[in-house]
A protein has these predicted regions:
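Hydrophobic, helix-prone linear segments
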Residues: 35, 47-49, 72-75
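A structured, charge-rich N-terminal accessory region that forms the first stable segment of a protein
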Residues: 25, 30-40
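C-terminal interaction segment
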Residues: 2-21, 25, 42, 58-71, ...
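A short acidic/basic microdomain associated with nuclease active sites
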Residues: 46-58
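Short hydrophobic alpha-helical runs that function as membrane-insertion/retention elements
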Residues: 127-131
Length: 228
């Protein structure tokens, strides 16, 4: 007697690339997200082993697509710099983010300070920063946490002479600064704020126009600007 075995096809596990929700709640959040990802990509452009991403799903348990988190911005060291539709830790030698930043809003505040914080600690995210571009839902407006023995502790805040708030990121080697309520990344090695390509072009144009006005003023005074 021959025993037949019924073949039951195995349905492949799907790991969605999106959840249908908008990337950002409003213009402030969107502009902030674009600024952060852009300047960090520029800053690490010569590092093929540093991956910067924004609003990308991170799946951290193979076979369990519900084990997922989507940071607004994250940076991973020690992985290939390439485009991804999602980030699956088991495909990246179990590398998890070293740095995460959440752009906090009314809808995300409780999750950013609760469930996500726990997940990031579980994943070993060394630094976790939060920023509220409106200043309405997070006080102080810019906050940082650093992981020490599986627990997060606040990153010390420095207030500069001009009132600028500064928090150092050991992971990035940069400072996160709050200038008039606006988040900027600052490189102390070059003493410069990180700018997008568009901001650099605008700053260069403004400097050129200022120089032209000054030269014109000197000529009015019968002074050759080229002689100075």
């Amino acid at each position: 007697m021959t025993t037949s075995v019924e073949y039951i096809p195995v349905t492949p596990i799907e790991y969605p690339d999106e959840d249908g929700k908008p990337m950002a709640e409003g213009d402030l959040q969107r502009k902030c997200l674009v600024y952060i990802t852009t300047v960090l990509e520029i800053y690490f452009q010569k590092r093929p082993d540093v991956y910067v991403a924004g609003n990308l799903f991170i799946y951290y348990e193979k076979g369990y697509p519900e084990s997922v988190v989507a940071p607004d911005v994250f940076v991973v060291f020690g992985v290939e710099k390439r485009d991804r539709r999602s980030y699956k830790t088991w495909e990246e030698n179990d590398k998890t983010p070293n740095f995460v930043l959440e752009i906090t809003s009314k809808a995300t505040r409780s999750k950013d300070q609760g469930a996500k914080k726990g997940i990031y600690a579980f994943l070993g995210v060394r630094e976790y920063f939060q920023y509220d571009p409106t200043g309405d839902y997070l006080n102080p407006q810019l906050q940082g946490l650093r992981l020490v023995e599986n627990n997060y502790f606040p990153v010390a805040t420095n207030t500069l002479a001009d009132g600028t708030v500064s928090l150092p990121s050991e992971v990035l080697g940069l400072e996160l600064r709050l200038e008039a309520g606006k988040l900027r990344f600052y490189d102390s090695a070059t003493d410069k704020t990180l700018l997008t390509h568009e901001e650099e072009a605008n700053a260069r144009k403004a400097a050129e126009e200022k120089a032209q006005r000054l030269a014109a003023k000197l000529r009015e005074l019968n002074i050759d600007p080229d002689s100075l």
